[in-house]
Every structure is written in C-alpha cells, then in structure tokens.
Amino acid sequence: MLCLASGSLLAALPLTAFTLAWTHSIEKTRWEEDWQVRGRQLLPVAARIRGSGAGMEIPAGAALKDGVWHYVPTLPPQGGLLLRHSPYVAGYELCADGRCRPLADLLPGMAEISENAGGNAIIELKPCPEGKTP
C-alpha cells in the first residue's frame, strides 16, 4: 500500500508497484521511474528518459531503444520520496495499471496546500505502515 501526504492531506493507494513520471521543466522531456513497494521501503527498479540536456545526463549502462534511454537506477531502497509541487511547472504523474493521473489530483485540496506554502508544497510518497491507512 502506498501512502501520499502533503500538509494535512492523506491518501492511501492499494499499489505494490507504480511509475512516477514528470516533464523536465527546461528541456520539456519526459522522465519515468518504476518503483515497487517492498515492506517499509520503496525500491527503484527501472527508469526511462526521453532525451538528454541540461542536468539530464544519461546514466552509464543506459540503452537507447526507440528514442528512449532505459536504465536500472543505482539508488538504494528509500523510506519515502519527497516531491516538490509547484503551480509554475508541470506536476508529477503517478501511473499504475496502464493509467496515469496527476499526483496532485490524488490529494484533493492540494491547490490550497500549495497556495498556503507559497507555491512550493511537498508531497511525500511512502509505504503505508502495516495495518494502518489514513
């Protein structure tokens, strides 16, 4: 189970795997990372970059397939992810079961939280504690 939190907003999604996607604010290219929920950690399992550019170095060992760089992240398992939500750039998307949704849409009231935070709210993704959901 994946928990999302921002300020007083909480949501739980019945997911054991998901893709986090976003568009680079300068280069306008899509990034995608596949994650698995494993116990109390998030494990990065694969990633794709649809181009390169400023601050977007292609990792060693990446393979180019149909114009997309594919690689396996070397990042260790994480207890959670902190993502900045701003109305000034395209937001993150959470994809599962072949469907993508804006991450902020999964937390109704996110626009108000972002406004109260001066346009720079944080969304936390982490495994839900076992037996506990918001």
Predicted regions and their residues:
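Generic detector of intrinsically disordered, low-complexity, polar/charged segments
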Residues: L4, R50-S52, L64, C95
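N-terminal secretory signal peptides
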Residues: G7-P59
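Short N-terminal edge-element motif at the start of the domain
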Residues: M1-G7
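Mature, soluble, non-transmembrane domains
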Residues: I58-P134
